[in-house]
Every structure is written in structure tokens, then in C-alpha cells.
Amino acid sequence: MKCPRCGKQEIRVLESRSAEGGQSVRRRRECMSCGYRFTTYERIEFMPIMVIKRDGSRESFNRNKILQGVMRACQKTQVSVKQMEELVNEIEEKLQLEDVQEVTTLRIGEMVLERLQRLSEVAYVRFASVYRKFQGIKDFVTELEQLERLETHLRRDLERPLRNSPPSESESTASPDWVGGIPQLLDQNDTSSNLSEIPK
């Protein structure tokens, strides 16, 4: 390996360690001639994947291109560089495990959005605005509404086991309306009950 500064080949390794979740080895190197220090990464060589672009043309899968797009979307957010790299690693690993030879930019974009949604709403909307080519504020509002609906469904899925789980002994004693794990509504014939107080 040649020194990127002086071009000499007398290089020594100062430090080696696992990186990118075990997907690569990071090595810190030093040129013995000029003293310049630099970092290299050794990665597993996966089978090449071709990316089908919107216009039908094809190009080789480039993880750095995806990472740059994610970094732009995550500017001034709390998402760390490590989290961004892990996001791209996860996408690349998933595609390799699926043993696909071709993948569309549409599929890659959706995979990125799915993961950004868990990291940052701001980054999600930024990436979506470029990926889905927003034309105006209406597109942003539509995307935000869709994101809100998704989060609502996720919260309901997380809360459902809690609502359906049987009550503890103390809850059973304190709440006589609970029968068989299902809360009983007030008697519909009870005209004294306030309908606004019935949980919806």
C-alpha cells in the first residue's frame, strides 16, 4: 500500500480494531517516510449488486452514495455518524442475505425511510422530500400525516398486549366491572350515566 501523501510504500500499522458492527476492520497506519497517518478499512467483498435507477439505467451499488444522502438528511439532528453507518450496513447486509443481483432505487429509498423513521422525524421528512420529489408544502403535510398515522398504529400495537392482559389481584378487587380480562361498559339502560365519560 502506498502513502496517500508521498507515494512511498513503507507503511506500518499502528492500530487495528473491529468496526461497523463486525463488518469491517479499521486500521490506523503511518508512513515510515513522511510520518503521515491515515485510516483504512478492510471489508468483506460481497457479490456485486446492480441498482436500477428511475430512468431504467443501471449502476453498481454504492454504499457511500446512500450514506451521503442519509448524512444530508440527518444534518443538525441528534443522529450520530455511527447510527448512520449502522443504517447503511443494515441495508447492505439485508440485500446480501436476500441474494439479489438487482435492486431498484425505489426499494433502497423505502428501506432508508423505514429506518430513518425510527431515528429522526426531521431526517425522515428531509429524505422523503428529495426521494419522493416533493413539489410544495402540500406534499410535506401529506407525508407528515402519513408518518403520524404510522406512529399511531405502532403505539396501538405496543399498547394492545397491556390492554388485553389479565388484571392483577389488586386491579381485580378495585375494579368490579372487569370480567374475564375485558372491561365492561356501563349499562346502556342507565340514563343517569354521562356519555361523555364513556371511553372511546
From Swiss-Prot:
Its cofactor is Zn(2+). This is Transcriptional repressor NrdR. Binds 1 zinc ion. Residues 186-200 have a biased composition (Polar residues). Residues 158-200 are annotated as: Disordered. Negatively regulates transcription of bacterial ribonucleotide reductase nrd genes and operons by binding to NrdR-boxes. A zinc finger (unnamed) spans 3-34. Belongs to the NrdR family. It comes from the Bacteria. InterPro entries: ATP-cone_dom, NrdR-like_N, RNR_NrdR-like. The gene is nrdR. GO terms for molecular function: ATP binding; DNA binding; zinc ion binding. One of its GO terms (biological process) is negative regulation of DNA-templated transcription. The keyword Ligase does not apply. It holds the Pfam family ATP-cone. Residues 49-139 form the ATP-cone domain. The keyword Magnesium does not apply. Keywords: ATP-binding, DNA-binding, Metal-binding, Nucleotide-binding, Repressor, Transcription, Transcription regulation, Zinc, Zinc-finger.
